[in-house]
Regions:
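Dynamic helix-loop-helix/coil hinge segments at AAA+ ATPase domain boundaries and subdomain interfaces
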Residues: 1-3, 198-199
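Conserved alpha-helical scaffold flanking the Walker A/P-loop in AAA+ ATPase domains
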Residues: 5-9, 67-87, 116
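Walker A/P-loop
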Residues: 8-53
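Walker B catalytic acidic pair
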Residues: 21, 89-90, 101
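P-loop (Walker A) phosphate-binding loop of NTP-binding proteins
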Residues: 22, 61, 129
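Conserved AAA+ P-loop NTPase core
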Residues: 49-80, 137-146
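Canonical AAA+ ATPase core
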Residues: 68-72, 94-98, 106-198, 238-241
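C-terminal engagement/docking regions of AAA+ P-loop ATPases
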Residues: 217-294
Length: 294
């Protein structure tokens, strides 16, 4: 439930999400389900999956201009990245050149082919995965690309009861295709506007800014979170509050989002250390300061 709440908050906030998890935990199923549950302008949202490999080329994901001999002109064939929901599977298995092509559409919400610019449909959401176990043949994501992801989440393994229900129900592709939209396109846009309008008390907004700034001076980090991280943090806080049925942000929201929003953006001085532990310590210290008036 917590994972779905955070993922929904990321979508409502207009951000992209990085999933760091092992194979077979349902990342593709989650992305497909989201695409089925939100209606687009002309039916369900368009879902595309890109399997990143070392031999992938930029135009494999962005699209390419093809010469049409009948019209004697070039015709643009869109790539899979020009969809509503894009699952970028094992993004760290492709070259930096291809990663930068994905970075452009994530950051600018457009693809440039030659002198032409093409935009993905709205809403546009990238759900990228990387495998933390396998390291051979990978190209680590640069800080600039990691910073484009609003959150990094992990599904994790299901508990025993959930796993038993999976074995008993044996969910199939037919069950996924049977899902019907629960939000119209207009309702989804209204939800995004409602999320942006959620109230955040100046004290909590200040605490969020201080948490981000503290990562830049913390002894455990050689690289702290950027100002963009602060913007993402605030946007995610408001969206999560709406998901939980509130019109205001609480300190619980700050604690819930500190690690998902900030941990993937920092660089550790000691690679054996855990960024999550230090982020939690920073967050708790700032929240205690609010309670004590410090």
């Amino acid at each position: 439930r917590e994972f779905l709440e955070l993922l929904t908050a990321g979508i409502l906030a207009g951000g992209h999400v990085l999933l760091e998890d092992n194979p077979g935990l349902g990342k593709t199923t989650v992305a497909k389900a989201v695409a089925r549950l939100i209606a687009g302008k002309d039916g369900p949202l368009v879902f595309k999956r890109i399997q990143f490999t070392p031999d992938l080329l930029p135009y494999d994901i962005t699209g390419v201009d093809i010469f049409d001999p009948e019209t004697r002109s070039f015709r643009f064939v869109p790539g899979p990245v020009l969809a509503n929901i894009v699952l970028a599977d094992e993004i760290n298995r492709t070259t930096p050149k291809v990663q930068s092509a994905l970075l452009e559409v994530m950051a600018e919400r457009q693809v440039t082919i030659g002198s032409s610019t093409h935009r993905p449909p709205e809403p546009f959401f990238v759900l990228a995965t990387e495998n933390p176990v396998e390291s051979e043949g990978t190209f680590p994501l640069p800080a600039a690309q990691l910073d484009r992801f609003m959150m990094r989440l992990s599904l994790g393994y299901p508990d025993r009861e959930t796993e038993l229900s999976i074995l008993e129900d044996n969910p199939s592709e037919n069950a996924l295709n049977a899902l019907k939209p629960v939000l119209t396109f207009e309702d989804f846009l209204a939800a995004r506007q409602a999320a942006a309008a959620v109230f955040c008390h100046p004290d909590l907004k200040g605490a969020a800014a201080d948490i981000v700034r503290d990562t830049r001076i913390h002894r455990a980090f050689v690289l702290g979170a950027s100002p963009r991280a602060g913007l993402h943090y605030l946007e995610a806080l408001k969206a999560l509050a709406l998901v939980k049925g509130r019109e205001y942000v609480t300190d619980e929201d700050l604690a819930a989002l500190a690690v998902p929003v900030l941990a993937h953006r920092v660089r550790l001085r000691d690679p054996r250390a855990q960024a999550e532990k230090h982020i939690r310590e920073i967050c708790l210290a700032r929240l205690e300061g609010i309670k004590t008036g410090a």
